[in-house]
């Protein structure tokens, strides 16, 4: 049985296919992506609190949203990086998902609005991820209990950022105890059985993903750089344990 939210999303995308194609302006794709999120949004989820905050990173300010579930007793804070093929998505497109995950896990969430391509190409999003993890670890009492542990979570392109952030900070004693990677793309050069089988007609299109990678990398040619392709890392010693979540009919499935 297909979940009602998934059925609604598939129906909406079929009726509004512009979101899938780079021939549309980035502004139009972002608007359509938000419309998809609103179309599939479930019933409102009651929270103890939902608060918009600003993270003062070096040379820039990032927007973030802090979620505290009802009956909060969590000893962990989940730092969440949304999906959107490096180019689209924001706090609003993934707001309901964060509420649902926070409520289900009984954990506090901090969702990050990192900078997007093409306005801010590689390595802007990666730098935002790494600097965010450092800032949150150094200011943990602002977001969670002082002895809370950190979990880094990302879906799709946010999964790439989560994986890279966890790897790049693995020796910095940030108390990151786990990384959860949902449908993460692991590099622009990867070709798999699932990308061949599901790369067209299953919402996420191979051609669109390649186009978004081009915008994101903006001419950067070293695809063996582990910040681009996390699987190319030579040494992951001390990296937090990872949970990989994949979907059957997803071109990115085998990258997990």
Task: Identify the meaning behind each predicted range.
Residues 1-69:
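A glycine/proline-hinged amphipathic helix-loop "lid/cap" segment
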Residues 74-84:
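Short beta-strand element of the alpha/beta-hydrolase
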Residues 82-88, 249:
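Active-site glycine-rich loops that stabilize anionic/oxyanionic intermediates
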Residues 92-112:
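Short amphipathic alpha-helix adjacent to the substrate-entry channel of hydrolases
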Residues 120-142:
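Alpha/beta-hydrolase active-site loop
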Residues 143-156:
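Alpha/beta-hydrolase fold nucleophile elbow
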Residues 147-148, 163-255:
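Alpha/beta hydrolase fold serine-hydrolase catalytic domain that processes acyl esters and thioesters
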Residues 154-164:
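Glycine-rich nucleophile elbow surrounding the catalytic serine of serine-hydrolase chemistry
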